[in-house]
From Swiss-Prot:
Disulphide-bridged cysteine pairs: none
Chief location: cytoplasm
Gene: aspS
Broadest EC class assigned to this enzyme: ligase
Protein name as catalogued: Aspartate--tRNA ligase
Positions bound to L-aspartate: 174, 220, 445, 486
EC number in record: 6.1.1.12
GO biological process: aspartyl-tRNA aminoacylation
Keyword Transmembrane helix: no
Organism (species): Flavobacterium psychrophilum (strain ATCC 49511 / DSM 21280 / CIP 103535 / JIP02/86)
Keyword Ligase assigned: yes
Family statement: Belongs to the class-II aminoacyl-tRNA synthetase family. Type 1 subfamily.
CC annotations in GO: cytoplasm
Subunit structure: Homodimer.
């Protein structure tokens, strides 16, 4: 037995008890006649004492050779600690060591294994196994485990069954790029790694497994944006014989359960917002509703004056920012430069200061009088001491720019409190979106999403107006889950493929197995998938998902610890009948 207790459980009730501990040397303090060592494991830190007058001489001298991160086993007696440490659970005691074995030595770590480390992100990624020893990373992984356990418990109590689906599947060109896997046994043919278990969970519904879930790895070979991973984890769920309301209620319940059990927070019924309302009011389909700054459209009061910029714009839209009416011209100019960056893309910005005396001062006073500006303030909800920022241009583009500004200002003003949780449902998404590059419609979610029955007649005449039986759960400005009611009959699915530009042959080749299954009594069904990595990070109060993943990739999709991806041997390529063309 390497240990009788862990390094986080001993206290004053164990005084005079003989114990065995094992762990890593955090640090040591040599006072000549006495030596203290902090021993660390996953559970905490226990102080060891080596006393020249009470410890075996060999053990005492051996303690002087210990370096950081040495792995040791000690035996000794629990004694009361003279200088108590209230910051750790074992701070009332220490161990008078009688025996010690060095289980393994260690090189000096390339960064300090402390809560606040001197290691940059790159070096910590390279030595991730050392980074995991640090409390922030370790605690993040333990928190992820708790979330996963609560999910499994909640869904299992509702008779959901966890079923594993295949990782080696068929490639489908629709959507993001697949990671492909060559098949040695089937020359010239390839598997794909799943972007989601979508079709398999639908087939499970056809198979009668009416409540399915899975915590599953998914893969997308796409250009990585900040804080994205090529492999990610979903809480994937599907149910048969349900309508949209059933799914919203169950998974709202799951989220409320997680908030209560893990954060001690009771949340009221989630508000619901249509996609169109979210886009018009917040400029995106995942609004952060922890704070206000809702959009006010100013076309009625800003156009048809003498200001050519607004007159030429499709949309003039603004937000009122609380408490920044005293911003200096330098601060305002810096914000204008911020929105003009390529990442945002605005051509400029108009501002209006709402003075305490009820008057207004703007950058366009030449064109608009106090009455006009009063209408702007009323439309945006601006009060004395606030400032109104106005953007103009093409409607969709301008809303996106103002949304970026809204989020940036909220961050600067401390309005995005990570300890506050504001969930909502966004519903009634468009079924289709038009892609200018390809010149055809694409499914906004995926090709298996059911249109709202009352909009079916619009598919031929006005496809962009067809709404989907689709829904997203949004938490603090992040989409943490999304799903839909699925198409469950062959004819409707064939019609959907047609509107998405598939030929009959293409549809049959890619999804014939699903179409065939629909001919054998497919039940009405629908589902949802949560992004576990993002959900855990938000519940854990962090901006980045990386610390909640044991071995993440960097922003280039590389694992710098194991140096992957890597070149494979020519013999392997030959065996797979693959010839590289890297010109």
């Amino acid at each position: 037995m390497y240990r009788s207790h862990n390094c986080g459980e001993l206290n004053a009730t164990h005084i005079n008890k003989e114990v065995t501990l094992a762990g890593w040397v955090q640090k040591s303090r040599d006072k000549g006649f006495m030596n203290w060592v902090d021993l660390r494991d996953r559970y905490g830190i226990t102080q060891l004492m080596f006393d020249e007058s009470r410890s075996d001489k060999t053990v005492f001298e051996l303690a002087k050779t210990l370096g950081r991160e040495f792995v040791i086993q000690v035996k000794g007696t629990v004694i009361e600690r003279e200088a108590k440490n209230k910051n750790i659970s074992t701070g009332e005691i220490e161990i008078l060591v009688t025996q010690m074995t060095i289980l393994n030595s260690s090189l000096t770590p390339p960064f300090t294994i402390e809560d606040e480390t001197d290691g940059g992100e790159d070096i910590r990624m390279k030595y991730r196994y050392l980074d995991i020893r640090r409390n922030p990373v370790k605690n993040s992984l333990l928190f992820r485990h708790k979330v996963a356990m609560e999910v499994r418990k909640y869904l299992s109590d509702l008779d959901f069954c966890e079923v594993e689906t295949p990782y080696l599947i068929k490639s489908t060109p629709e959507g993001a790029r697949d990671f492909v896997v060559p098949s040695r046994m089937n020359e010239g043919q390839f598997y794909a790694l799943p972007q989601s278990p979508q079709t398999f969970k639908q087939l499970l519904m056809v198979g009668g497994m009416d409540k399915y879930f899975q915590i599953v790895k998914c893969f997308r070979d796409e250009d990585l944006r900040a804080d994205r991973q090529p492999e990610f984890t979903q809480i994937d769920c599907e149910m048969a014989f349900v309508e949209q309301e059933d799914i919203l209620n169950i998974f709202e319940g799951l989220t409320r359960h997680l908030l209560k059990e893990l954060k001690g927070i009771e949340v009221e019924k989630f508000p619901r917002m249509t996609y169109n309302h979210a886009m018009k009011t917040y400029g995106n389909d995942k609004p952060d509703i922890r704070f206000g700054m809702e959009f006010g459209e100013l076309n009625e009061y800003a156009k048809h004056k003498d200001f050519p910029v607004f007159n030429a714009a499709e949309l003039v839209v603004a937000i009122a920012v609380p408490g920044v009416g005293e911003y200096s011209r330098k601060e305002i100019d810096a914000l204008i430069e911020w929105v003009k960056r390529p990442q945002v893309g605005a051509s400029g910005m108009v501002y209006v200061k709402c003075n305490e005396d009820g008057t207004y001062k703007s950058s366009v006073d030449k064109f608009y009088d106090q009455g006009d500006l009063s209408h702007w303030a009323k439309t945006t909800g601006a009060k004395a001491g606030d400032m109104i920022f106005v953007l103009s241009g093409p409607a969709d583009k301008t809303r996106a720019q103002l949304s970026a500004l809204r989020m940036e200002l909220a961050t600067r003003l401390g309005l995005r409190n990570p300890a506050e949780f504001a969930p909502l449902w966004v519903v009634d998404f468009p079924l289709l979106e038009f892609d200018e590059e390809s010149g055809r419609y694409h499914a906004m979610h995926h090709p298996f999403t059911s249109p709202k029955p009352e909009d079916m007649h619009l598919l031929e005449t006005d496809p962009k107006s067809v709404r989907a039986n689709a829904y997203d759960m949004v938490l603090n400005g992040n989409e943490i889950g999304g799903g839909s009611i699925r198409i469950h009959d062959k004819n409707t699915q064939a019609l959907m493929f047609k509107y998405l530009g598939f030929t009959e042959e293409e549809a049959k080749n890619q999804f014939g197995f699903l179409m065939d299954a629909f001919q054998f009594g497919a039940p009405p069904h629908g589902g949802l998938a949560f992004g576990l990595d993002r959900l855990v990070a938000i519940l854990g109060g962090q901006e980045t998902i990386r610390d909640f993943i044991a071995f993440p990739k960097n922003n280039s999709g590389r694992d710098v610890m194991i140096d992957a991806p890597s070149i494979i041997d020519d013999s392997q390529l030959k065996e797979l009948h693959i010839q590289l063309d890297l010109k």
